[in-house]
Amino acid sequence: IIHNDKIINSKKGAYHSNIHSFIFEDSVVVINDDYKILTDNMHYNSKNEVTYFFGPSLIISNKKTIYCENGWYNTKTDIAQLRKNSQIKTEKYLLKGDSLYYNKNLQYGKALSNVQLIDTLENITIYGEIAEYFESEEKIIISEKPILELLFEDDTLFMHAKQFFFNQNGDEKKILAYDKVKFFKTDFQGKCDSLSYDFTDSLVEMFNKPILWSDGFQITADSLQFLIKKGEISCVFLKPNPMIILKEDSLDYNQIKGKDMTAYFSNNLMSRIDVKGNGQSIFLIKDENTEDKIGLNYSECSDLILYFKEKKLKEVTYETKPISTTIPYQDIEEKNRYLKNFYWRGSEQPMSKEDIFN
Protein backbone atom coordinates (compact mmCIF):
# COMPACT_ATOMS: atom_id res chain seq x y z
CA ILE A 1 0.00 0.00 0.00
CA ILE A 2 0.98 3.65 -0.39
CA HIS A 3 -0.04 5.94 2.45
CA ASN A 4 1.14 9.56 2.62
CA ASP A 5 4.94 9.37 2.28
CA LYS A 6 5.21 5.63 3.00
CA ILE A 7 5.24 2.53 0.83
CA ILE A 8 4.40 -0.73 2.64
CA ASN A 9 4.98 -4.16 1.08
CA SER A 10 4.42 -7.68 2.43
CA LYS A 11 3.57 -11.17 1.19
CA LYS A 12 0.37 -11.35 3.25
CA GLY A 13 -1.99 -8.65 4.42
CA ALA A 14 -5.46 -7.76 5.66
CA TYR A 15 -7.42 -4.59 6.39
CA HIS A 16 -10.01 -3.93 9.13
CA SER A 17 -11.79 -0.77 8.02
CA ASN A 18 -13.74 -0.29 11.26
CA ILE A 19 -10.51 0.24 13.23
CA HIS A 20 -8.38 1.62 10.33
CA SER A 21 -5.92 -1.22 10.86
CA PHE A 22 -3.74 -2.98 8.31
CA ILE A 23 -2.17 -6.32 9.21
CA PHE A 24 1.03 -7.24 7.37
CA GLU A 25 2.81 -10.59 7.59
CA ASP A 26 5.89 -12.17 6.02
CA SER A 27 8.71 -10.03 4.58
CA VAL A 28 7.19 -6.71 5.56
CA VAL A 29 9.03 -3.65 4.22
CA VAL A 30 8.14 -0.02 4.98
CA ILE A 31 9.98 2.56 2.88
CA ASN A 32 10.15 6.27 3.63
CA ASP A 33 12.61 9.00 2.62
CA ASP A 34 14.12 8.99 6.14
CA TYR A 35 13.91 5.35 7.20
CA LYS A 36 13.14 1.76 6.27
CA ILE A 37 11.34 -0.83 8.43
CA LEU A 38 11.91 -4.59 8.08
CA THR A 39 9.78 -7.11 9.99
CA ASP A 40 7.59 -10.20 9.59
CA ASN A 41 4.55 -9.21 11.63
CA MET A 42 3.35 -5.62 11.73
CA HIS A 43 0.08 -3.79 12.27
CA TYR A 44 -0.41 -0.30 10.88
CA ASN A 45 -3.14 2.14 11.92
CA SER A 46 -3.77 4.45 8.98
CA LYS A 47 -5.62 6.99 11.13
CA ASN A 48 -2.90 7.74 13.67
CA GLU A 49 -0.04 6.40 11.47
CA VAL A 50 1.33 4.13 14.19
CA THR A 51 3.06 0.85 13.37
CA TYR A 52 2.99 -2.02 15.88
CA PHE A 53 5.68 -4.70 15.86
CA PHE A 54 5.17 -8.34 16.85
CA GLY A 55 8.48 -10.14 16.42
CA PRO A 56 12.01 -9.21 15.34
CA SER A 57 11.94 -5.80 13.66
CA LEU A 58 14.46 -3.28 12.29
CA ILE A 59 14.09 0.47 11.79
CA ILE A 60 16.97 1.55 9.57
CA SER A 61 17.91 5.19 9.04
CA ASN A 62 20.98 6.95 7.69
CA LYS A 63 23.27 6.68 10.71
CA LYS A 64 21.64 4.11 12.98
CA THR A 65 19.62 0.92 13.19
CA ILE A 66 16.95 0.32 15.84
CA TYR A 67 15.97 -3.26 16.72
CA CYS A 68 13.20 -4.70 18.88
CA GLU A 69 10.92 -7.73 19.15
CA ASN A 70 7.85 -5.88 20.37
CA GLY A 71 6.71 -2.25 20.39
CA TRP A 72 5.37 0.58 18.29
CA TYR A 73 6.59 3.45 16.15
CA ASN A 74 4.56 6.57 15.38
CA THR A 75 5.56 7.44 11.82
CA LYS A 76 3.94 10.89 12.10
CA THR A 77 5.68 12.07 15.29
CA ASP A 78 8.81 9.88 14.90
CA ILE A 79 8.40 8.55 18.44
CA ALA A 80 9.08 4.88 19.22
CA GLN A 81 8.42 2.77 22.32
CA LEU A 82 10.18 -0.56 22.00
CA ARG A 83 10.37 -3.64 24.19
CA LYS A 84 12.07 -7.04 24.32
CA ASN A 85 15.75 -7.01 23.29
CA SER A 86 15.51 -3.42 22.10
CA GLN A 87 18.67 -1.67 20.92
CA ILE A 88 20.07 1.28 19.02
CA LYS A 89 23.12 0.59 16.89
CA THR A 90 25.29 3.32 15.36
CA GLU A 91 28.66 3.22 13.63
CA LYS A 92 30.29 3.91 16.99
CA TYR A 93 28.40 1.93 19.64
CA LEU A 94 25.47 -0.30 20.55
CA LEU A 95 22.92 0.63 23.24
CA LYS A 96 20.71 -2.16 24.64
CA GLY A 97 17.88 -2.33 27.16
CA ASP A 98 14.75 -4.29 28.04
CA SER A 99 12.73 -1.29 26.86
CA LEU A 100 13.65 1.71 24.77
CA TYR A 101 12.00 5.07 24.13
CA TYR A 102 13.19 7.15 21.19
CA ASN A 103 12.11 10.58 19.91
CA LYS A 104 13.71 11.34 16.56
CA ASN A 105 12.74 15.04 16.51
CA LEU A 106 14.26 15.66 19.94
CA GLN A 107 17.15 13.32 19.09
CA TYR A 108 16.64 11.76 22.50
CA GLY A 109 16.38 8.17 23.67
CA LYS A 110 16.02 6.38 26.99
CA ALA A 111 16.77 2.73 27.75
CA LEU A 112 15.49 0.99 30.89
CA SER A 113 16.44 -2.23 32.71
CA ASN A 114 19.46 -4.43 31.91
CA VAL A 115 21.08 -1.59 29.98
CA GLN A 116 24.32 -2.16 28.10
CA LEU A 117 26.43 0.34 26.19
CA ILE A 118 28.96 -1.51 24.03
CA ASP A 119 31.87 0.08 22.18
CA THR A 120 33.62 -2.74 20.32
CA LEU A 121 36.34 -0.44 18.95
CA GLU A 122 37.54 0.44 22.46
CA ASN A 123 36.61 -2.94 24.03
CA ILE A 124 34.39 -1.25 26.59
CA THR A 125 30.97 -2.15 28.02
CA ILE A 126 28.98 -0.11 30.55
CA TYR A 127 26.11 -1.82 32.39
CA GLY A 128 23.31 -0.10 34.29
CA GLU A 129 19.55 0.18 34.72
CA ILE A 130 18.95 3.56 33.04
CA ALA A 131 20.60 5.14 29.99
CA GLU A 132 19.75 8.48 28.39
CA TYR A 133 20.82 9.05 24.81
CA PHE A 134 21.41 12.59 23.47
CA GLU A 135 22.04 12.08 19.78
CA SER A 136 23.01 15.61 18.67
CA GLU A 137 25.51 15.92 21.53
CA GLU A 138 26.80 12.38 20.99
CA LYS A 139 26.37 11.78 24.70
CA ILE A 140 24.98 8.87 26.73
CA ILE A 141 24.40 8.98 30.51
CA ILE A 142 24.20 5.65 32.35
CA SER A 143 23.02 5.43 35.96
CA GLU A 144 21.48 3.15 38.62
CA LYS A 145 24.27 0.85 39.85
CA PRO A 146 26.37 1.22 36.70
CA ILE A 147 29.56 -0.74 36.17
CA LEU A 148 32.15 -0.22 33.46
CA GLU A 149 34.27 -3.02 32.03
CA LEU A 150 37.31 -2.08 29.96
CA LEU A 151 38.88 -5.11 28.32
CA PHE A 152 42.64 -5.18 27.81
CA GLU A 153 44.68 -7.90 26.15
CA ASP A 154 45.30 -9.93 29.33
CA ASP A 155 43.06 -8.33 31.95
CA THR A 156 39.89 -6.31 32.56
CA LEU A 157 39.38 -3.05 34.46
CA PHE A 158 36.14 -2.83 36.47
CA MET A 159 34.82 0.57 37.56
CA HIS A 160 31.79 1.70 39.54
CA ALA A 161 30.37 5.21 40.02
CA LYS A 162 26.95 6.75 40.48
CA GLN A 163 26.91 7.94 36.85
CA PHE A 164 28.90 7.44 33.66
CA PHE A 165 28.91 9.95 30.80
CA PHE A 166 29.96 8.58 27.43
CA ASN A 167 30.94 11.49 25.14
CA GLN A 168 32.07 11.46 21.54
CA ASN A 169 32.86 14.60 19.56
CA GLY A 170 34.23 13.68 16.15
CA ASP A 171 37.34 11.60 16.73
CA GLU A 172 37.51 12.60 20.41
CA LYS A 173 36.03 10.09 22.82
CA LYS A 174 35.78 10.41 26.61
CA ILE A 175 34.19 8.64 29.53
CA LEU A 176 33.39 10.70 32.61
CA ALA A 177 32.60 9.02 35.95
CA TYR A 178 30.93 10.96 38.74
CA ASP A 179 30.56 10.46 42.47
CA LYS A 180 32.17 7.71 44.55
CA VAL A 181 34.35 6.34 41.77
CA LYS A 182 36.20 3.09 42.45
CA PHE A 183 38.04 0.84 40.03
CA PHE A 184 39.85 -2.49 40.16
CA LYS A 185 42.35 -4.16 37.89
CA THR A 186 44.64 -6.91 39.12
CA ASP A 187 47.75 -4.70 38.85
CA PHE A 188 46.30 -1.32 39.87
CA GLN A 189 43.31 0.07 41.74
CA GLY A 190 41.95 3.53 42.47
CA LYS A 191 39.39 5.70 44.18
CA CYS A 192 38.25 9.33 43.76
CA ASP A 193 35.17 11.52 43.55
CA SER A 194 35.24 12.01 39.77
CA LEU A 195 37.29 10.74 36.85
CA SER A 196 37.75 11.19 33.11
CA TYR A 197 39.26 8.76 30.62
CA ASP A 198 40.33 10.17 27.25
CA PHE A 199 40.61 7.43 24.63
CA THR A 200 42.62 9.69 22.30
CA ASP A 201 45.76 9.53 24.44
CA SER A 202 44.70 6.94 27.10
CA LEU A 203 44.96 9.58 29.83
CA VAL A 204 43.05 9.05 33.07
CA GLU A 205 42.43 12.12 35.27
CA MET A 206 41.27 11.69 38.87
CA PHE A 207 39.81 14.50 40.99
CA ASN A 208 38.91 15.20 44.65
CA LYS A 209 40.99 13.12 47.06
CA PRO A 210 42.27 10.76 44.36
CA ILE A 211 44.27 7.71 45.35
CA LEU A 212 45.98 5.11 43.20
CA TRP A 213 47.49 1.80 44.31
CA SER A 214 50.03 -0.03 42.17
CA ASP A 215 52.93 -2.38 42.90
CA GLY A 216 52.35 -1.90 46.64
CA PHE A 217 52.68 1.89 46.41
CA GLN A 218 49.98 4.27 47.65
CA ILE A 219 49.94 7.33 45.38
CA THR A 220 48.03 10.51 46.27
CA ALA A 221 47.81 14.19 45.26
CA ASP A 222 45.19 16.89 44.93
CA SER A 223 45.05 16.07 41.22
CA LEU A 224 46.29 12.80 39.77
CA GLN A 225 46.74 11.80 36.13
CA PHE A 226 48.10 8.59 34.68
CA LEU A 227 48.73 7.16 31.23
CA ILE A 228 47.74 3.63 30.26
CA LYS A 229 49.84 1.86 27.65
CA LYS A 230 48.91 -1.64 26.50
CA GLY A 231 46.74 -2.10 29.57
CA GLU A 232 49.44 -1.06 32.04
CA ILE A 233 50.22 2.20 33.84
CA SER A 234 53.21 3.82 32.16
CA CYS A 235 53.50 7.02 34.23
CA VAL A 236 51.63 9.02 36.87
CA PHE A 237 51.60 12.84 37.11
CA LEU A 238 51.03 14.28 40.59
CA LYS A 239 50.41 17.86 41.69
CA PRO A 240 49.90 19.64 43.96
CA ASN A 241 50.61 18.04 47.35
CA PRO A 242 51.78 14.68 46.01
CA MET A 243 52.86 11.85 48.28
CA ILE A 244 53.91 8.28 47.54
CA ILE A 245 54.03 5.73 50.36
CA LEU A 246 55.29 2.15 50.44
CA LYS A 247 54.41 0.10 53.51
CA GLU A 248 57.29 -1.91 54.99
CA ASP A 249 55.29 -3.34 57.89
CA SER A 250 52.66 -2.22 60.40
CA LEU A 251 55.09 0.29 61.91
CA ASP A 252 57.35 1.61 59.15
CA TYR A 253 56.57 3.29 55.83
CA ASN A 254 58.84 4.60 53.08
CA GLN A 255 57.59 8.06 52.05
CA ILE A 256 58.27 10.59 49.30
CA LYS A 257 56.68 14.01 48.81
CA GLY A 258 57.35 17.24 46.94
CA LYS A 259 55.77 20.02 44.91
CA ASP A 260 55.39 18.10 41.62
CA MET A 261 56.08 14.42 41.10
CA THR A 262 56.10 12.01 38.17
CA ALA A 263 56.22 8.26 38.77
CA TYR A 264 57.27 5.85 36.01
CA PHE A 265 56.37 2.19 35.74
CA SER A 266 57.85 -0.64 33.70
CA ASN A 267 56.02 -3.98 33.42
CA ASN A 268 53.65 -2.90 36.22
CA LEU A 269 56.57 -2.19 38.57
CA MET A 270 57.62 1.20 39.92
CA SER A 271 60.95 2.06 38.27
CA ARG A 272 61.52 5.76 38.93
CA ILE A 273 60.11 8.82 40.70
CA ASP A 274 61.03 12.37 39.67
CA VAL A 275 60.49 15.03 42.36
CA LYS A 276 60.47 18.70 41.37
CA GLY A 277 60.50 21.21 44.23
CA ASN A 278 60.49 20.77 48.01
CA GLY A 279 61.55 17.13 47.85
CA GLN A 280 61.41 15.15 51.10
CA SER A 281 61.79 11.46 51.80
CA ILE A 282 61.90 8.95 54.63
CA PHE A 283 63.30 5.48 53.97
CA LEU A 284 63.82 2.53 56.26
CA ILE A 285 67.42 1.27 56.14
CA LYS A 286 67.94 -2.48 56.54
CA ASP A 287 70.94 -4.74 56.76
CA GLU A 288 71.36 -6.25 53.28
CA ASN A 289 72.16 -9.69 54.68
CA THR A 290 69.98 -10.03 57.76
CA GLU A 291 67.13 -7.62 56.86
CA ASP A 292 67.48 -6.20 60.39
CA LYS A 293 66.30 -2.60 60.74
CA ILE A 294 69.23 -0.19 61.06
CA GLY A 295 67.51 3.19 61.04
CA LEU A 296 65.41 5.76 59.22
CA ASN A 297 66.97 8.09 56.66
CA TYR A 298 65.39 11.54 56.32
CA SER A 299 66.40 13.62 53.28
CA GLU A 300 65.50 17.04 51.90
CA CYS A 301 66.41 18.23 48.42
CA SER A 302 64.64 20.58 46.02
CA ASP A 303 64.83 18.19 43.04
CA LEU A 304 65.70 14.52 43.09
CA ILE A 305 65.23 11.28 41.14
CA LEU A 306 64.69 7.94 42.87
CA TYR A 307 65.24 4.59 41.13
CA PHE A 308 63.52 1.41 42.27
CA LYS A 309 63.80 -2.30 41.60
CA GLU A 310 61.34 -4.80 43.06
CA LYS A 311 59.96 -2.17 45.47
CA LYS A 312 63.43 -1.43 46.82
CA LEU A 313 65.20 1.92 46.50
CA LYS A 314 68.37 1.31 44.47
CA GLU A 315 69.69 4.79 43.74
CA VAL A 316 68.97 8.47 44.36
CA THR A 317 70.18 11.32 42.15
CA TYR A 318 70.13 14.77 43.76
CA GLU A 319 70.00 17.89 41.60
CA THR A 320 71.39 19.97 44.48
CA LYS A 321 73.20 19.04 47.67
CA PRO A 322 70.71 17.32 50.00
CA ILE A 323 70.20 17.65 53.72
CA SER A 324 70.26 14.08 54.98
CA THR A 325 70.02 12.55 58.45
CA THR A 326 69.92 8.92 59.54
CA ILE A 327 68.41 8.11 62.93
CA PRO A 328 69.42 4.76 64.49
CA TYR A 329 66.36 2.56 64.71
CA GLN A 330 66.40 2.27 68.50
CA ASP A 331 66.43 6.10 68.81
CA ILE A 332 63.45 6.80 66.55
CA GLU A 333 60.63 8.79 68.13
CA GLU A 334 57.07 8.46 66.87
CA LYS A 335 57.04 12.02 65.50
CA ASN A 336 60.06 11.22 63.30
CA ARG A 337 58.44 8.26 61.55
CA TYR A 338 56.20 10.26 59.24
CA LEU A 339 56.34 13.19 56.86
CA LYS A 340 53.79 15.98 57.30
CA ASN A 341 50.30 15.02 56.06
CA PHE A 342 51.14 11.32 56.12
CA TYR A 343 47.93 9.28 55.86
CA TRP A 344 47.88 5.55 55.15
CA ARG A 345 44.64 4.52 53.39
CA GLY A 346 45.24 0.83 52.86
CA SER A 347 41.82 -0.13 54.24
CA GLU A 348 40.19 1.69 51.31
CA GLN A 349 41.97 -0.31 48.60
CA PRO A 350 39.68 -2.51 46.46
CA MET A 351 41.07 -6.04 46.54
CA SER A 352 38.56 -7.53 44.09
CA LYS A 353 36.00 -6.34 41.55
CA GLU A 354 33.30 -6.88 44.19
CA ASP A 355 34.98 -4.29 46.44
CA ILE A 356 34.25 -1.45 44.01
CA PHE A 357 30.64 -1.49 45.27
CA ASN A 358 31.65 -1.12 48.94
Question: Positions of the model-derived regions?
Answer:
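Mature-chain termini and adjacent capping regions
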Residues: I1-N358
